[in-house]
A protein has these predicted regions:
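Active-site-proximal polar cores
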Residues: 1-27
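Short, conserved turn/kink motifs that form compact alpha/beta structural patches or helix kinks used as
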Residues: 18-21, 26-115
Length: 115
């Protein structure tokens, strides 16, 4: 299967990891990592979280394993994505394979309320 075309991978975002939470619930984020050649699409998909509650996704991030940069990114649930000043929280990480080789990731995200 061919990689996702660079013509479609038109967005750049910043990926943040939570490094601590204080006793009042304020979260501290790391300096962030810029991801380029990715795609963000609006979404209305409904999923179930780890507590079996229904959650409606706000957007899906597409990360191609060949064309997206940097190439050594590891996505985890609860990381934060900043796209054009709007923050999103990762809720699902779905690796998709071409035969036995990882082709791309589809990352389900909800709006992150603590801007």
């Amino acid at each position: 299967m061919k990689p996702i075309s660079k013509k479609l991978l038109i967005h750049t975002v910043t990926l943040y990891k939570k490094i601590s939470t204080d006793k009042w619930g304020s979260e501290k984020l790391d300096p962030g990592q810029t991801l380029s050649n990715i795609r963000i699409e609006p979404s209305k998909q409904i999923i179930r979280d780890k507590n079996n509650a229904e959650v409606q996704l706000a957007a899906t991030l597409f990360y191609d394993c060949r064309n997206s940069r940097p190439s050594d990114v590891s996505f985890k649930v609860d990381q934060i994505i900043d796209f054009n000043g709007q923050k999103y929280q990762i809720k699902t990480v779905e690796p998709l394979y071409d035969n036995s080789k990882l082709h791309h990731y589809e990352i389900g995200m909800v709006r992150y309320g603590k801007n």
